[in-house]
Amino acid sequence: MKSLWNDNVAKTFANDPLQLRVYTSQLLGREAGLVLHGGGNTSVKVKTKNFFGDSEEILFVKGSGCDLSKIQISGFSPVRLEVLKRMATLDRLTDTDMVRLQRSAMTDSTAPDPSIEAILHANIPFKYVDHTHADAVVAITNNKRGEALIREIYKDRVLIVPYIKPGFKLAKKIYEMTHKKDWKRFEGMILMQHGVFTFADDAQTSHERMIYLVSLAEDYLQKQGALDNVARSEAKENLFKLSKIRRHVSRIKGNAMLVKLDQSSEACGFAGLSNVESIATCGPITSDHLIHTKPIPVILGKNVEKEITDYSSSYKAYFDRNTDGHLTPLDSAPRWGIWPQYGTIAFGRSIKETIVVSDIVHHTIRVIQWGEAIGGWKALSEKQIFDMEYWELQQAKLQRDEISPVLQGKVALITGAASGIGLACTEMLHEQGAAVVGLDINAEITQIFNQRDMVGVHCDITDDRAVKKAVEMTVRCFGGLDILIPNAGIFPDSQRIEDMDENTWERSMDINLSCQQRLLKMCIPYLKEGIDAAVVFISSKNVPAPGPGAAAYSVAKAGQTQLARVAAMELGCDGVRVNIVHPNAVYDTALWTAEVLESRACQYGCTVEEYKTNNCLKTEVSSKDVAELVCAMVGPAFAKTTGAQVPIDGGNVRVI
């Protein structure tokens, strides 16, 4: 591992130890082989003056859960050093009381909670302290010969600490091991089955000691051939089965979950190992990952429903074996899975969660194989894993009410998403928690929606291959499909039947009806495996109340409505709801050009303004109004409604 330290950059912070701490923390955070997603912690000890002008020593320690790769000064918690030092001398301290004491010793109440290892940082007698969960090091510490290998690699350079649960007990143990020792003898600490600490009175030395100690571990693994001991193979694909996996995991979890499928050669290689079940189900590479991954993955095969159900039962038995009778069980759904021939799968309530889990899994499968190559991978004991997963601070979080967006974890596909009603629906579905894929013939769609959970796809809905590819991409990206909004359509120029050219008629029938049927047909297999799946067709007031000169449009939309009604009957037994909205006078859509408005007003013998407010409520209906109705119809409010036609038109007399 190479140091990313840059003298020229560091010089700009020479007189600001806290800003220098930010800089070196970010350097560590950018190395995925050192820390992942909120893991690790750093600190700096600084003398400052309080409100009374008195000098105080303050430990600025990384706030709990803050990401080192992006941390700023606001991500550090300022805690009075003397209080933290005295805490280490206590005989007993619950973790809950530890957190309270640490917060009471903070000099800024708006800062995040200090790291649970703040006491440990405080009692290391150096200005700068760095802590990581380096892959190379934990591959060696989590080994049947772990301590012997660490001594062989580091000799007397480091203090070796046996595994103890992070928090007060770990800080107390290290305090007892070192309070009569000369810290200058050590370049760092290796915490068995946990990670690495380095320290120094200047930031560069502490940082480069970390890189050096990790490099020694990497060199050892390289010499043993471990770094090359990573299986690889090509992936197969079964998107329908993927959607079934997601459905069953969501059922166990009790809410919709997103999926991130890793089909990389490394993921497929690991999943295909003959001994994968035994080596992958020992436990995490560091207890820090438990909050994201649970103790072990689910192993998937031919009968995914049974395998996921068995995993749930096994997790409940694990809880029953270890609980003291006063703990609240976590849900029993897996957070990742091993799918032989297909790769690894991460599950999460949001795309952010799935990315965190997937990244951890990517490193986990490497570290396990490295460990196997040097004598045998060995994780923590079941009891140690349980104690960490169910420690009191985690239990306290269960008592807090977490309000999730109503569509959190759902997957939605919308056509005609670049403007008007489609744009509004896509944005609002995303706001309400869904991962969304928007299709449009406008190439700018890829720029309009370019987030990880809000994807724009350039697609002509008359191109069946392109539509099929987009549907499959949706399932591949998020694991399934729950919401379908067929919105794309055209509004032909006004033509009376006797004057209508064949192309106008055929084009309207193709885009407004036939394409909708083909899209629905492609999506049905995935919708049947969806979570409370729902389809909402964006139809038109022209179905219940057609107007002269709009035969091509009205007939196609009427056909679309009949398609939706039949679909509601056919799919009801599979739990898929199909409803229709009939908007009218939504003038912020691409359909309503100035020319179209003028033409329609002429048909009714009125001005454009009179035409736009021609409803009982004398109000205009916006795309956002339609989107709000659509979101309600795919949500729990309409959970027991299917086959319904709901007008949203301000009260059209002819419809009423």
List each model region and its residues:
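Canonical Rossmann dinucleotide-binding motif of NAD(H)/NADP(H)-dependent dehydrogenases/reductases
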Residues: 407-436
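Alpha-helical segment proximal to the catalytic Tyr-Lys
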Residues: 525, 569-570, 639
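Catalytic loop of short-chain dehydrogenase/reductase
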Residues: 536-559, 564-573, 584-587
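Substrate-binding pocket helix/loop in short-chain dehydrogenase/reductase
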Residues: 495-497, 501-506
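Short C-terminal tail/terminal secondary-structure segment
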Residues: 491-494, 638, 642-656
